[in-house]
C-alpha cells in the first residue's frame, strides 16, 4: 500500500484488518512516499513497532503511484500480493474469503471482490456487485478495480508499471495479469469500501484527467500484445473505452438471414434500413419465405429481387413455423462464412453495424455478437440476456434509451451468457460446430440454447451497445395467446430446465448473485 500525504486518522482505519484478524498469515507493506511528513512517519513507525507483520519501505521522494507500488512489490514475501488505496477500508474477513477461494482452487492466479463507497458521513452506499471474469467489460473499464490480488509468482513475470500508466496503473496491471492467469476468481461479497473524497475519482471523475489517457494506452497495449487489430478511444463516460475491432482483410461476405411471413411493409422497412444505411457493402440478404398468403408480399418479393438481383435471394420454407428449422434452412442456403440472423421487424439505426459486429465476431474467442435493441418508444428492449430466474430474461428492459443503467453497464461492450437472435452474428464454423439451432425449440429460447452451446465450447457471447436497432417485437408472429401456444411454451421451458440444469444451479456467471432476477425488466436494478 502506497502512502502519500495520507492523513493519519485515515491511516488508522487501515489497521482494522490487524485489530480484528480473521486470518493471521499476512504482511502489510507500507510504502511511505512522504518522507518529510513527520506526523505520518511517526504513525508508520508506531504501527510497525506494534506488529512485526507490518513493514515500511521509506522512499526518498514521491515517484508516482506506479513506481511507489513497484517498491512494495519488490520486497513482498507472500504467495499473493494485494493492492489497495491508502485511505480506504477493508472488511475483517476479506483475507479469509480470499484464502478460502485459493484453498478451493489451486489454479487461482487473480482475485477480486465487490465493493461500495464510504461516504463523508461514514455511511456505506452505491454497492458495485460485479460479474465474474468478463474480458470485454475489462477492456471497456477497470471493473475489477480495488483489492486486486495476484499470485506473486505470476506478478514476478510481468513487466512493472511505469509512470506513463499513473492513474490507470491498476487497469494496466490487471490486463497484463489476466493475459497469463490460469484462473480469475470473483468473490461475490462487498469486502472493500472506497472512500469518497474531492480528489478521488470515486467522487470526481475530473480529478485525474490524465487517468483516461493512461487507460486508453493500457487497453491498446493489451490488445496489441494479443495481436488483435483494434482501435481504442474514450467512450461516452469517463474512464471507459470504446474498442473497435478491425474487419478481416479478406472483407468477407456476410449473409443476413431474415425469416418472414406477410406484412410486406414491415419487411420493407427492415430491408430499406439495411440497404440505405449500411456502410459495409459485402453482404447478401437471404429472405426465408414462410407460408405468406398476401398478394402484396409476393409482389414485394418480385420487386425486391428485380431491383437488387446481386444482393437479395429468396428461399421458401413450406412447412409450419419453427424458428429453429427456419434458421437452419436459411443458413444451409447462405453463401457467407459470417451469418447475421435478423428478425424482419427490426430497423437499423447504426450505419456501421455490420463491420462493428463483424470485427468482434472475427475474433477467435468469440462465438456470437448481439446488439442493443429499442422499442419504438425509445425504451430498451434488449441489452443482453441473463440466464437465470426462470429460463432467461432481457437486461435493462423498458429503461429509457439514454439511461445507461446500473454502473452504466448497458452502455458497456461486455460478455454475457446469451443475446437475442432478433439480431445476432455468428461464424458459420461455430454455428455448425454446435449443430445450429435446436429444432425441438420451435419458438422460445432457441437463441439462449444456441448461445449456451457456444459457451459450452468456451466461445464468448459479446454484447455491443455500439450497434443499435429498433425492434417492433412479434409483429409477424403475434403473442402466446392461445392454449396450444402456451402448451408449446411450457414444453420449451421444460427442455431448457433439463438441458441446462447445471447452468441454472450454478448461476449465470455474468450476473452477480446479489441481484433480484425474477422480475422482468428489473434485472440489474433490484437488490
Question: What are these model-derived regions, one by one?
Answer:
Residues 66, 74, 125-153, 166, ...:
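A recurrent flexible, glycine/aromatic-enriched loop bordering the glycosyltransferase active site
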Residues 59-76, 317-334, 352:
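Glycine-rich, basic loop-to-helix element that forms the pyrophosphate-binding segment
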Residues 1-207, 221:
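Nucleotide-sugar donor-binding/catalytic module of glycosyltransferases
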Residues 208-251, 377, 389-416, 420, ...:
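C-terminal, non-catalytic tails of nucleotide-sugar-dependent glycosyltransferases
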Residues 93-125, 197, 346-391:
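Conserved donor NDP-sugar-binding/catalytic core segment of glycosyltransferases
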Residues 154, 164-190, 219, 353-357, ...:
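A short, conserved alpha-helix in the catalytic core of glycosyltransferases
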Residues 18-58, 275-316:
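Acidic donor-binding segment of Leloir-type glycosyltransferases
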Amino acid at each position: 500500500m502506497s502512502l502519500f500525504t495520507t492523513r493519519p486518522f485515515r491511516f488508522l482505519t487501515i489497521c482494522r484488518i490487524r485489530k480484528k484478524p480473521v486470518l493471521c498469515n499476512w504482511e502489510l507493506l507500507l510504502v511511505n512516499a512522504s518522507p518529510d511528513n513527520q506526523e505520518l512517519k511517526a504513525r508508520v513507525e508506531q504501527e510497525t513497532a506494534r506488529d512485526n507483520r507490518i513493514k515500511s519501505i521509506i522512499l526518498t521522494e514521491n515517484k508516482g503511484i506506479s513506481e511507489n507500488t513497484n517498491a512494495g512489490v519488490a520486497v513482498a514475501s507472500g504467495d499473493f500480493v494485494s493492492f489497495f488505496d491508502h485511505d480506504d477500508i477493508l472488511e475483517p474477513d476479506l483475507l479469509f474469503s480470499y484464502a478460502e477461494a485459493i484453498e478451493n482452487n489451486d489454479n487461482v492466479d487473480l482475485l477480486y471482490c465487490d465493493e461500495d463507497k464510504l461516504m463523508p458521513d461514514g455511511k456505506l452506499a452505491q454497492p458495485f456487485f460485479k460479474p465474474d471474469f468478463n474480458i470485454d467489460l475489462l477492456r471497456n473499464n477497470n471493473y475489477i478495480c480495488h483489492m486486486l490480488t495476484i499470485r506473486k509468482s505470476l506478478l514476478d513475470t510481468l513487466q512493472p508499471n511505469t509512470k506513463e500508466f499513473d492513474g490507470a496503473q491498476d487497469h494496466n496491471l490487471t490486463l497484463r495479469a489476466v493475459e497469463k492467469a490460469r484462473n480469475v476468481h470473483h468473490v461475490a461479497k462487498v469486502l472493500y469500501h472506497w472512500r469518497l473524497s474531492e480528489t478521488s475519482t470515486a467522487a470526481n471523475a475530473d480529478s485525474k484527467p490524465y487517468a483516461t489517457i493512461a487507460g486508453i494506452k493500457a487497453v491498446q497495449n493489451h490488445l496489441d500484445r494479443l495481436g488483435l487489430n483494434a482501435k481504442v478511444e474514450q467512450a461516452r463516460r469517463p474512464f471507459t473505452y470504446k474498442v473497435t475491432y478491425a474487419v478481416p482483410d479478406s472483407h468477407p461476405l456476410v449473409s443476413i438471414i431474415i425469416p418472414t411471413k406477410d406484412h410486406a411493409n414491415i419487411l420493407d422497412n427492415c430491408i430499406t434500413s439495411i440497404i440505405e444505411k449500411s456502410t459495409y457493402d459485402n453482404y447478401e440478404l437471404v429472405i426465408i419465405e414462410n407460408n405468406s398468403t398476401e398478394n402484396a408480399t409476393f409482389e414485394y418479393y418480385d420487386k425486391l429481387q428485380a431491383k437488387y438481383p446481386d444482393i437479395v435471394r429468396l428461399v421458401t420454407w413450406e412447412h409450419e413455423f419453427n424458428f429453429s428449422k427456419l434458421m437452419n434452412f436459411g443458413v444451409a442456403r447462405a453463401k457467407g462464412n459470417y451469418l447475421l440472423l435478423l428478425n424482419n421487424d427490426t430497423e437499423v439505426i447504426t450505419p456501421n453495424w455490420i463491420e462493428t459486429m463483424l470485427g468482434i465476431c472475427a475474433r477467435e474467442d468469440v462465438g456470437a455478437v448481439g446488439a442493443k435493441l429499442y422499442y419504438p418508444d425509445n425504451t430498451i428492449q434488449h441489452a443482453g440476456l441473463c440466464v437465470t430466474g426462470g429460463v432467461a430474461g432481457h437486461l435493462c428492459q423498458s429503461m429509457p434509451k439514454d439511461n445507461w443503467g446500473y454502473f452504466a453497464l448497458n452502455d458497456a461492450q461486455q460478455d454475457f451468457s446469451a443475446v437475442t437472435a432478433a439480431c445476432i452474428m455468428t461464424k458459420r464454423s461455430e454455428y455448425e460446430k454446435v449443430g445450429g439451432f435446436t429444432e425441438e425449440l420451435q419458438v422460445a429460447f432457441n437463441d439462449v440454447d444456441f448461445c449456451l452451446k457456444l459457451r459450452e465450447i468456451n466461445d464468448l457471447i459479446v454484447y455491443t451497445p455500439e450497434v443499435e436497432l429498433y425492434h417492433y417485437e412479434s409483429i409477424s408472429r403475434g403473442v402466446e395467446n392461445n392454449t396450444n401456444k402456451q402448451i408449446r411454451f411450457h414444453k420449451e421451458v421444460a427442455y431448457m430446465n433439463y438441458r441446462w440444469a447445471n447452468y441454472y444451479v450454478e448461476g449465470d456467471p455474468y450476473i452477480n448473485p446479489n441481484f433480484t432476477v425474477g422480475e422482468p425488466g428489473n434485472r440489474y436494478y433490484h437488490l
